[in-house]
Amino acid sequence: MSFREIKAGEKAKHPEDHGKKQSSSWINGMENSTQASTSVEKRNHHWRSYKLIIDPALKKGQHKLYRYDGQHFSMPNSGIAPVDCVRDPRIGRIWTKTKELELSVPKFKIDEFYVGPVPPKQVTFAKLNDNIRENFLTDMCKKYGEVEEVEILYNPKNKKHLGIAKVIFATVKGAREAVQHLHNTSVMGNIIHVELDTKGETRMRFYELLVNGLYTPQTLPVGTEQDASPTVNETLQLTDSLKRLKDSNLSSVGSSVTPNSSTPFSHDTAYSSCRQDTPNSFSQFTPQSQGTPHTPRLGTPFSQDSTYSSRQTTPVYHFGQDSGYKHRRHETKFTDAYNRRPGGHHYVHNSPGVFRGTEHQFSTFKSHQQEPVQFSHTPPLSHSSSSSYKSAFSPYQAPAVFPQSEEQPFAQTSREAEYRRPAPPPAEMVVESSAATSADFAPVKEKPEEPPPLPDSNSAPEPSAPSFSQTPERSETPGTPTMESEMQHNSLDSRIEMLLKEQRTKLPFLNEHDSDNEVRMEGSPISSSSSQLSPIPMYGSNSQPGYRAQTPSSRPSSTGLEDISPTPLPDSDDDEPIPGTASLNQNSRGTSEASMTPIDQLNRASKVETLEVKEMVPGDQTPTSEKMDESQHSSGEDMEISDDEMNSAPITSAECAKTIVVNSSVSNAAVMAPSIPPLPPPPGFPPLPPPPPPPPQPAFPMPPPLPPPPPPTHPAVTVPPPPLPAPPGVPPPHILPPLPPFHPGMFPVMQVDMISVLGNHWGGMPMSFQMQTQMLSRMMQAQNTYQYPPFMGGRMQFVNLPPYRPFSMGAARGRGQQWPPLPKFDPSVPPPGYEPKKEDPHKATVDGVLLVIVKELKAIMKRDLNRKMVEVVAFRAFDDWWDKKERLAKASLTPVKSGGELEEKPKPKDRITSCLLENWNKGEGLGYEGIGLGIGLRGAIRLPSFKVKRKEPPEAASAGDQKRIRPSTSVDDEDEESERDRDASDTTSDLSKKDAEAVGLRRRPARPLELDSEGEEGDETSGKEEESSSEKEEEQEEEGGLVKAAPGKEEEEDEDDEEDEDDDEDEEDEEDYEETGVETSDKEEEQDSEEEDAASPSSSKAEVESSDESEDSSEFESSSDSDEDDDEEEEEEEDEEEEEEEEVAEDQDREAMVAETEHEPASHELPDDKRETILELYPVDYMDATGLGLSEPALVEKDEGMEEVKAEESECDQVPEESIAAETLKQLVMERDQETKLALSPICRPVEEPEPIVMLEPEVQECPKPESQDEAGTVCLSTPVAVFGEARPSKSSFFSKSDDSCLETHVKTKLPSAVEEEDRLPRTPGREVVVHSETDILLLPAHKVPSSTVPLPSTPGKEESVVPPEKFPEQLMVTKTSIEEEIPRTPGRDILAKSSHPLGKSQSTDTVPATPGSDAPLTGSSLTLSSPQVPGSPFSYPSQSPGINSGIPRTPGRDFNFTPTFPEAGATIPCLLSGKKQSEDDLDEKPFKEPLGASLTISMNSVPSPIPFASPTQADFRTDMGLPPNEPIPIAALPCIPGDGRMPIEECKAEVKSVLLSPEAPVGASILPPPPPHSVLPKRRPGRPRRSPPSVLSLDMYSGKTIEPPPVPVALVESAMSKELLSAHPDAFYGLKDPEAVTLDFRNDSFHEKIAAETVAEKLPFKELENQWNEDFKEEEAHAKPKRQWRRQKKSPEHLPVIPSPEYSPPQPQFRPRSEFEEMTILYDIWNGGIDEEDIKFMCITYDRLLQQDNGMDWLNDTLWVFHPSTSFSTPKKKKRDDGMREHVTGCARSEGYYKIDKKDKLKYLNNSRAFAEEPPADTQGMSIPAQPHASTRAGSERRSEQRRLLSSFTGSCDSDLLKFNQLKFRKKKLKFCKSHIHDWGLFAMEPIAADEMVIEYVGQNIRQVIADMREKRYEDEGIGSSYMFRVDHDTIIDATKCGNFARFINHSCNPNCYAKVITVESQKKIVIYSKQHINVNEEITYDYKFPIEDVKIPCLCGSENCRGTLN
């Protein structure tokens, strides 16, 4: 009965009686009821049941109450409701509360019955360590997303861990991220293989392989195929994207598409739906297993239903939801779907009236394909189709780009109708449409809007066309929205990347199509996916009806290719068969998709791609559009997979295809292009060798016979089969000869966007940009290897041209098709009737072979690269170690050695990087590079020449740049090595050459403090400041002496990067350098060797210099190498000393610095080659004008420079100013020269002498920046250089790039004693600055100073190529050599010099070695005058890499690295700031060690241009300074810039004035004349800042020394800068680096400088910048003394004017221009490390510049600047050393109050390096490091007292073991476990262990024997082979198998060094291992296991002399 719950408050039926006691008498349960129904009644009633409701026994006072039959009660008023009112007896309130119930969302089991694309959530792990268990794996994966299931597979037979695991993530993203982050990572010592394994197939394959004993867990073949996981990933991604598309499309389409395995999205897209609804154009193929669109083949993960692959609506088809025309090429599927679809969107081709019956369409299509008429239909459809499709894809459809007459009746065959897709508009249109689609559909991409009306299929014609344009993505990769998005995403990135890499520059097909393709490549399955994912079967393959659908690869192809199947156009093609397309269509569609082979599918994909493009064109009015849309569509989901796939996974087939999309595009474009150009050839074109598919027609009709589609599953390797013979008349697309065949899949990689494909993965292997560029160039070169390639190229070029309707090979125009629209069908595509496309019978074989070969090649390349990388790393590590040791040893020795050593140290590094990249540069191993993406790429983009001769492997860069070795660095590692060797020899000769100079250079050793590159290592290497300092100094000297070298190094690194872009130029430059021979060698070697060895020359130079410098500099700097290290300590003592010394040292340093500047430039003296380069960069005239040629004395240089400056100024905005400045500079230079001549010995020179000016020069340089580099150089020369001799005019130059060279030259020119004096005089940053500053500056007329007679060499030295080598060599050599080489770089000076140099070098911080003085390398990146202290000041502008400065706080004064980050101009500023005593670290850190002078010679104008100063506007400054408006502001003045915050503005003014007034000031004040506007720097890769004139100080260039880009004329700079920079000056003042604030003229240095400033960071990876900064910091540390001086200056701003801050600013270092490769690498680096705002600004400026310049970079025209947030976030520095002193947050130490400096930070500058020993190893893995404070942290007394206390607590009888045990606990031994030679893991001592000491306790679980036996058996079953059970006694065993400590790793030895002992501690027996003998560090700890003798012997592997042979 049903009870009704009595609700609360509800009364009982008889409330009145309720609760009353029933008075009736009870009888036997019968009551005398008083109820209405009397008891009698009741009694009489025959009760069937009764129940005792109330029992008095239970309830007191109650009467029995019965209830009868649930209704009647024994008592009339029982108060209880009868049963009919039954109520729930439970308390009602308990139900008032609602419980939240979480119902688990049912998850579909993904098994063989799973329908639809399987979400890629399942990840397969392979090669796992057998110790990894589920928990560990779960924890490992949790970080990437929720883990649903974790399963580790064990061998069922022996329960052994198979190293395979399955992890199912809750989200696809989690799975992808896990794969991305865990794949190929080391876990528990094993490099694990992680891949998306959607259905666990790979895992099961692994499982079978392992269980069958074919492989062991560690030998499991998880090669490229496994890497194919990318394919899987891609497929999965595609699936996701397809799903997304499907979701969006289906929803929009409204068609109930069964999730096609093929193309999830295909259903969604109008295209998809259309396809599904509409019989496929390939209807005839529908019969393929494909099934209808609704029932896509399950084969393909996403159902790559692309018509090609499975019925899955190919992404291509997805293009337009309305793209009925583009239904899957699988006719059946489409037809079925079409028929099924309510008014299925027949392809738009089908006239709305024409319902393509499945059969009809199929037949029609077949016939159509065969019948050109049908195809012809397509073209006509093209436009109307577009509309039709549009309706389907309305959102995406853009009005048909090319209105094509509506495809004639879609009534044409269903196929026809499908093909009726509007004929591809002319390629151009298509491309445009594509582009438009790309842009327009980008949104659609993700979800191509389903055709608004499903009617699309029927009325598809209308939407069709729009659909194409609207949903090209759908068309292209309907199923791979991800891909599409990816494409868009990648498209943009890829395009940018390509542009950057010049990969895409001009793939003609890249125009619009390129974008689309790129998009597609990246995101669109059509191109990319189709090609890659579903290898588009060769035409022939396509022709085979079932070929494609059948193949799994088809599925991958379908991923992106399916819709792009070779016959994508067939939709359009259906209507308008294209000769090639027709065949393609026929083949691809005719060929049952299902039956198609992967190749066929690939081809088909290709065809689809092409066709689709065409179809898209008709439908989209842009095949590309459609394609693009599809791509986009596809990219939506595809992107998820594809994007990740492409990005993280090796390029898979799909990826390749995508990438190939470019080719596809190309193919499409090419196909279209053929269509466009009269494509009579298509009919007549000889088929590609492989007859199967004709080469992709212009790109539409016929997917070029794709190379055999790579194994469908291996997206990464889509090896196009040998190009199939193009259908007659169908030339293969030009892009890659194989392209036509491969077209969609381009050689899976080649054709693909090199960037996307190669970038993402070369054959599944991530490729560096360099590799890609190399490959691209190679491919481009080999591009024409095929007969068709040229045509292809043309096609590609004409991608945008409306493709001619492909000629049907004898096929009549499709009915209703307007052949004209057919253009989308490339004429090269055979007509529908054309059967030559039938894939080559051997195509599959060929494709398979190619795939295998490609895989093998990829594997080989991967292996080789890995090996090379490993070797590089190992060698580098060794080199680093060696160098470190050498440095340590040398630290104590003369800095010379250290410098040499340091130089050497970088060398290996560079070599390593170079080697890594070398092959790529060489294109070695790039089997497909030869394919050539197309002339367009290389031609338009001028791909970097990978034959770049890295004359200067970044040796100097090795020191500085090596740390930030560019990908390009390894471009020509071998070359670099050879070059290095050559350079070394050259360097050697240079050394000999420079030995005289070296004498002057000797001082450099004092500069080890400035161990820019090495300094980093030094710091890193050793906590010893001394070491660091000496190293730094050495390095700095190397870098200083090799300032050019280091910058060169850096530059070389940059050049390596640049070498990518400027490879050719750089090659030339480098070659020039090489030609120059020794000089080049000097510079290059200095750079290279600095990288290599810090260049032998630099080494010797540095050594000599070091010697001199040490001697000289040690006088003042008190062995600045070591003293600087001790500076911190000495600082106090030395402070006083230094103050005195400062004056002396400053004078001397100034002299030395001048000398050094000169000397350094000398040492960095541009080799003739470099000079030539410089000359090349700067016309001879210009050089002459600027004094670059500087054959004549500095005066001539000055005059020339002045003239040049004037000319340039006039050319630039402020000719007058420049002229004035130039004249002034000339005068100043002349005066200065005279003065200099008078004071030949800078050392002895009074403060007034030029040398001090040199210090000032840096200031002046910085201030004025180079108004005229010539002037600047002249000034520099006139100053110390002048003193040294005429050569000295190069001083500015030396300040710049050629500081060392100048010094060298100077040294040569100058009296040895003078040089030596200079060199010997330690350059105290402050002192020299002060002395020179006041006297020199004062001597120099303010007017003159601004003019800077001697143009400071921009650091072109590093940039070598900046100055035309011709002029540059002699003068440069002389002046530069003497100055640069002769004068060791004092940190301060070097800062200036370096400042300039860093900027000058490559105008990229990377390139620019961090000048010790300037915290931030003067790379244009950081305008920062490296004065962390002054937040607002440009000087304080933090280095680009925060990490660089981060570390030890920098004192504003010291750390004030007045290395303006502005390239040239900025460089000078650092000099200015150097007055503030650029941090010694800065100097040290500065990769370039250049005299301050160079830096100083930065015309204020020029300075602001690159990087706004943190100083008043020039105008204000000039006004304050009393300088003429046009006159560059001397750096000296600048140092006082308020922004600097060190010197009051007044002081600054005074200082500037003094600098200006100082006759010698010109050197410092000399403003580098900007190179004449007409002077054209060597063309750099577009977008690349000109490396040549990086430094603001182009003085050398003008003087012939520095090869830094001449700064923009001062006037120009001033005008521009004052307008922009100065307008931004406030920002500049506040340290804001507003690249945009400065208008850079590419022709002007300022532009370069700015670019450099902005690009420096760009070029230099942030870490590199950081490295430089760190170097600077290290150098600062190294130059503790100078720091103190600076501090003093800082302390007494009043003195600052006296001690020009610029002193510390070394002239901008000159750097060898980066090679194209380097440039490319840098460019490409944004793909790896992102791009920061500065670089973005720089790029934007560069872009604008390039656009204005119009250097013939076609890609520029194809490039549109779109704002994008910065993607680069500086990553923590990798090297501890990089973490220099932490920059003070406020920029001022005093304002910070007290804060603790970490020991690590202190170690950087503390003398004692013992702290390092105290430091725990960086890698503590396997190390048992007690968690107690280091011994050093605990007072010995404390320890001893503890020991005594313990001893006293023991009784004499107590065994000492306990004491020892406690002692062990008290101080555990440092142990580590690592691989043992005895057996597996072993335990090793990390510290000496005395005999009989307790080593470690054997820890484990105490278990009984029984348990031990059980466990032993279980462990055996589990496959745990080793036994970790240690018997304590007869009944106790310690089991350390599962838990324990390192003792478990102790191996057995028959001759052990330890023994086990059981001791009792607190009644517990413990096993303790005691040492039997003294154990040395790293000695393995062993003991005798003493196993009982057994019959089964365990072999002993101890290998000891008395080994027993067995353990038992």
From Swiss-Prot:
Component of the SET1B/COMPASS complex. Residues 1577-1587, 1681-1690 have a biased composition (Basic residues). SUPFAM superfamilies: RNA-binding domain, RBD, SET domain. GO terms for cellular component: chromosome; cytoplasm; nuclear speck; nucleus; Set1C/COMPASS complex. It catalyses: L-lysyl(4)-[histone H3] + 3 S-adenosyl-L-methionine = N(6),N(6),N(6)-trimethyl-L-lysyl(4)-[histone H3] + 3 S-adenosyl-L-homocysteine + 3 H(+). Residues 1-20, 492-521, 606-617, 626-636, 979-997, 1021-1031, 1150-1172, 1378-1392 have a biased composition (Basic and acidic residues). Pfam families: N-SET, RRM_1, SET. A motif (RxxxRR motif) lies at residues 1840-1845. Residues 1-42, 249-390, 402-652, 682-725, 950-1172, 1309-1328, 1345-1461, 1563-1600, 1674-1712, 1814-1842 are annotated as: Disordered. Residues 111-199 form the RRM domain. Residues 1869-1986 form the SET domain. S-adenosyl-L-methionine binds at residue 1985. This is Histone-lysine N-methyltransferase SETD1B. One of its GO terms (biological process) is methylation.
